[in-house]
Structure formats: structure tokens, C-alpha cells
A protein has these predicted regions:
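A generic structural signal for short, solvent-exposed coil/turn residues
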Residues: 60-62, 73, 129-134
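Ligand-binding pocket segment of bilobal, Venus flytrap-like solute-binding proteins
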Residues: 2-71
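Residues on a specific face of well-ordered alpha-helices
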Residues: 1-2, 98
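Small-molecule pocket liners
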Residues: 77-81
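Extracellular/periplasmic juxtamembrane helices and adjacent flexible linkers that interface
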Residues: 88-168
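N-terminal low-complexity, Ser/Thr/acidic repeat segments characteristic of secreted
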Residues: 34-38, 83-85, 118-121
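Solvent-exposed loop/turn segments at secondary-structure junctions
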Residues: 53-56, 73-76, 87-89, 118
Length: 168
């Protein structure tokens, strides 16, 4: 997101930058926790590109060993949460699952999220954590990439951007 914004959305320059970035990746773990473990616990690599919460947890677990460098532009990642109706019905947990989902967006749960280094989605609660989160960061969303369907088509379909970067 940063490089694309910096370079005026020039796709060729963005691809060059991303290829160069991936060329420097020692280990491409399958998930955020694995990448953090590889970097923090195994000492592999010079830089960890991570979720905010992973960076904050690393600082808490290993004080004075790392520095968080916050970009001016990043992606607001909003993982989906849903009740899987058929599964909940089969296990008799529909009301419990729905209650959890409703609670997840309550002020109390949003504060718990912030206390555990997750960026609250409610603006008023996020403001309470202004000392923790950079509130001036330009956060792009999936909509800036044309929505999920378009982003998947442009970046993750066979032969598209990710394949071009990763396989060359």
C-alpha cells in the first residue's frame, strides 16, 4: 500500500519494489505468528513486517530489543467474524455464537481488544488508545483495491501479482 501510494499507483514500479522486498525474505512463514517466531525467537532476518499486535507483543515480551517503525501508510486489516449457521445449529450453540458476535463489538470487548494490542474498530474506543496506536496513519482499506473480489482477481489469481513476485 505504501509503495503504491508513494509511486502514484504506478503498477510497474510497485512490482519492482515488491520483488526487491521479497528477494530479501529469508523465511516466508505461512502466518503472522510463525513469522514473528522466526524473527524474534530464532533471530532470523533484519526486519519483521508484522501486524500491529504482533509488533506490540514482541516489544512486551522482549523489552528494549526491538524498535517499532510505523509507516505513514498501511492497510487496515479487518478479519471477518461470522456465525456458521449449520455448524452452530448442529452443536446447539447458535445463541451462544450470536451472543459472542454481538459482544465482540461492544465497548467492553473493544477495550479488551485495545488492551491486547488490537486496533479497536469503534472510533471512540480507539481514541482511548491514542498513546498506543498511531491515529494519524493513512489507513487504506480493501475498498481502495476495488473490494475483495477485485483485489483477489488482481493480486492472487493464478499468474497475477503475487505469483509474478513470488515465482520470479
Amino acid at each position: 500500500a505504501y509503495w503504491q501510494e508513494q509511486d502514484g499507483n504506478n503498477k510497474e514500479e510497485t512490482m519492482k519494489y515488491m520483488k526487491k522486498l521479497y528477494e530479501n525474505v529469508l523465511v516466508l512463514d505461512s502466518g503472522a505468528r510463525g513469522a514473528t517466531n522466526t524473527f524474534v525467537e530464532n533471530g532470523q532476518g533484519d526486519v519483521l513486517v508484522a501486524w500491529e499486535n504482533e509488533a506490540f507483543l514482541s516489544m512486551e515480551e522482549y523489552p528494549n530489543q526491538y524498535e517499532i517503525v510505523t509507516p505513514s501508510i498501511s492497510i487496515l486489516a479487518q478479519p471477518s467474524v461470522a456465525v456458521v449457521d449449520q455448524n452452530a445449529k448442529e452443536h446447539g450453540t447458535t445463541s451462544l455464537a450470536e451472543a459472542y458476535l454481538e459482544y465482540l463489538y461492544s465497548d467492553e470487548a473493544q477495550r479488551l481488544a485495545g488492551e491486547n494490542y488490537y486496533r479497536p474498530s469503534k472510533e471512540a474506543i480507539l481514541q482511548e488508545f491514542s498513546g498506543q496506536f498511531d491515529l494519524d496513519m493513512n489507513l487504506v482499506t480493501i475498498d481502495d483495491f476495488g473490494g475483495w473480489n477485485q483485489a483477489h482477481k488482481d493480486y492472487f489469481d493464478d499468474g497475477e501479482v503475487f505469483d509474478q513476485i513470488y515465482t520470479e
